[in-house]
């Protein structure tokens, strides 16, 4: 038997309750975008997901149900910043944009840079290779519009 002398890989920090809520909301939105099931059915399915009990339940509910309820308005808010029709977005990109747009509009207690970073992380974790760059660019432009004062103060 040989001993492994390689340096120990640092453990990733534990996910925050809000990050778990965002991940679960993205998964729920993905399901909803694909089959338009009743939001209650989508949510019930997610209750069995690993980590659901560690998620910020209130934030999850707000993101999932709020993004579904306001899907048309949220999509309309970021559509001017797209370089292609909404129908051509991957479901993961679209779900990440919905989560980010919802937080930018409704969760003003969360700094816009945090909102964008979290949406980018969702796209990196669940999306295609370059999708996160697209999500970043679209949400950055949306933030400049819906949180103009905050963005101007930070730049």
From Swiss-Prot:
Q: Which domain of life is it from?
A: Bacteria
Do you know which Pfam families this protein is assigned to? NusB
InterPro entries named in the record? NusB-like_sf (IPR035926), NusB_fam (IPR011605), NusB_RsmB_TIM44 (IPR006027)
Biological process (GO), any one: transcription antitermination
One MF annotation (Gene Ontology) recorded for this entry: RNA binding
Question: Would the keyword Lipoprotein turn up in this protein's UniProt record?
Answer: no
Q: Cite a GO CC annotation.
A: cytosol
The record, for SUPFAM superfamilies, names: NusB-like (SSF48013)
Keywords (A to Z) from UniProt: RNA-binding, Transcription, Transcription antitermination, Transcription regulation
State the family it belongs to: Belongs to the NusB family.
Described by its record, this protein's role is as follows: Involved in transcription antitermination. Required for transcription of ribosomal RNA (rRNA) genes. Binds specifically to the boxA antiterminator sequence of the ribosomal RNA (rrn) operons.
What the entry lists under PANTHER family is as follows: ANTITERMINATION NUSB DOMAIN-CONTAINING PROTEIN, N UTILIZATION SUBSTANCE PROTEIN B-RELATED
For this entry, the protein name equals Transcription antitermination protein NusB
Q: Which organism is it from?
A: Ralstonia nicotianae (strain ATCC BAA-1114 / GMI1000)
* Organism taxonomic ancestry: Bacteria, Pseudomonadati, Pseudomonadota, Betaproteobacteria, Burkholderiales
């Amino acid at each position: 038997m040989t001993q492994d002398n390689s340096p120990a890989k640092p453990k990733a920090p534990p996910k925050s309750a809000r990050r778990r809520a965002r991940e679960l909301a993205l998964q729920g939105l993905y399901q909803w975008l694909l089959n338009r099931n009743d939001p209650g059915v989508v949510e019930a399915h997610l209750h069995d997901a690993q980590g659901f009990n560690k998620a910020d339940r209130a934030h999850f509910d707000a993101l999932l149900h709020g993004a579904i309820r306001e899907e048309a308005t949220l999509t309309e808010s970021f559509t001017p910043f797209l370089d292609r029709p909404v129908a051509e977005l991957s479901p993961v990109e679209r779900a990440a944009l919905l989560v980010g747009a919802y937080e930018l509009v409704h969760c003003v207690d969360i700094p816009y840079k945090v909102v964008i970073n979290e949406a980018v992380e969702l796209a990196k974790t669940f999306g295609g290779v370059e999708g996160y760059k697209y999500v970043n660019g679209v949400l950055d432009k949306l933030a400049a519009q819906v949180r103009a004062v905050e963005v101007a103060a930070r730049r």
